[in-house]
Amino acid sequence: MTKNSYSNVNDNTPVLVGNSQLTDKRGIEGFNYLEILTEVSKKAIIDCESSTKLDDHIDTVAVIRFVADTPHRDSATSNLWGYPNMPRSLSNSLNLSASNEIYTTTGGNSPQIALNELANRIKDNQIDCALLAGGEALDTFVGRLKDGLEVNWEDNPGGEPELIGKSVDGTNDHEKLHGLFDPSSVYPLFANALRNEYGQSIAEHMQDTGELFENFSKVASKNKYAWFPTHRSAKEIAEVKPENRMIGLPYTKYMNSIMRVNQSCAIVMMSAKKARDLGIPESKWIFMYSGSCINDIWNVSDRINYHSSPAIKRCTDSVFELANISVDQVDFIDLYSCFPSAVQVAMKELSLNKDDPRGLTVTGGLPYFGGPGNAYVMNSIATMMNKLRSAPGKFGLATANGWYITKHGAGIFSSKPFEGEWNQVADTSYMQKTIDEANKPKFTEVPEGNCTVETYTVVHSRNGPDKGIVIGRLDDKTRFIANTERSSNVLEYMSQKDMLNTSGKVSNDGKRNIFKPN
């Protein structure tokens, strides 16, 4: 890579020039939300190695929304949220004079949405230099609440940030009524549909999933920022034990994302001209060769099936097309990994297998590296940046996912200088229209009669099987959602027997739909 190759980069080309990650395991003594963003942002600014004080040049501060600030969620944490304008709070904490304050909506796809937005504004000469930060301090927050300690975490600097992203609840009232809200209860529905597609028994699928996630935990074991830096075997991950209880059939605890973490990340993006003016070494420069965001059919109950994702396919196709490379030419990969089915659906759409020699994560994934709420992809991209800085000319792919395999993002990154006019955020409007207008299965909220199980899960509490969730089809193929009777006999039966494609009867009891196996 020559000096001349960097000189061919247009002034308004966006470049990622700094990043930092922080993991705080001090429990109840840990950082609050503002502190954990402030500390990591300071380090990201230092990482740029600017020859001129960078702080004075940051004109935009963007923050990924925190879980405790999630609309539509009634919880102790959301009721205690005390940062009405976190971008301004962060700007003030860092003594910046940023004129643009941006806050994202809910979703694990938010970091890619933010990068796309910031990159386009740099390209259009609307902004010059942006700081993007995100993370969680839930371990400290929840720990203090449980111990009865004060949580006076608040700062109100005035003003309202600009909101970017789609702010719509991930489920409708009918889905929520039947238990489709907590991700740990929804992603297992995709898992059982996947094993039906692959012709796997429950045990075979759990073993296959254990092998997939053993590879992830191995990466996490070598990551100094990982919340759980432990290499677990496939057997450890798949085997149900008191310390690894079933959460939602077929997923054990070790297959679930861990969100109660204190982790944060910050990334600095600016125009190539600004990077040159500030004397930032070209060895720090990483280019976003393409970025794309697109949604699947919004509601889970309306999906065509539960083993594929038209949006992931279109999203990743679009970033490869814009970057003018194929998946085979990517050297580093990070697939969003909140639950195994999120990875497996993406693998299917990208034609990847679990033993790909490149690996499918650069961090270790959300169950092992940690799942800092909506901000995880910040960490995967920061990790990707560092790998690419040490691998001149190589490419990396990072994917993102919000809600329930609902909202998707993808980005391709490289240290290879981008030459020519930068216009690398995909226009997905036509693709989105095609997905939204697809023929959805007929659905009824009040099913009655004979039926067949399309997919299902048994949600477990610490005391054992607690609730059955069934998505099924009536004889005329009309889809429905139902619960099962909460008797121990029924729940134990459903926990032991493979219920896929089995028959039963469904009816409405006046409150919700109830499925009874034959």
Regions found by a protein language model. Give the residues of each.
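Beta-strand segments within the central parallel beta-sheet cores of soluble alpha/beta enzyme folds
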Residues: 54-65, 100-106, 131-134, 204-212, ...
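Active-site-proximal alpha-helical scaffold in enzymes
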Residues: 105-136, 181-222, 267-274, 322-325, ...
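Short nucleic-acid-contacting surface segments enriched for D/E, G, S/T with interspersed K/R
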Residues: 489-507
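Phosphate/pyrophosphate-binding loops at sites that engage ATP/ADP/AMP, CoA/4′-phosphopantetheine
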Residues: 43-59, 94, 316-329, 353, ...
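Condensing-enzyme catalytic core mediating Claisen C-C bond formation in acyl metabolism
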Residues: 2-37, 156-181, 187-215, 247-307, ...
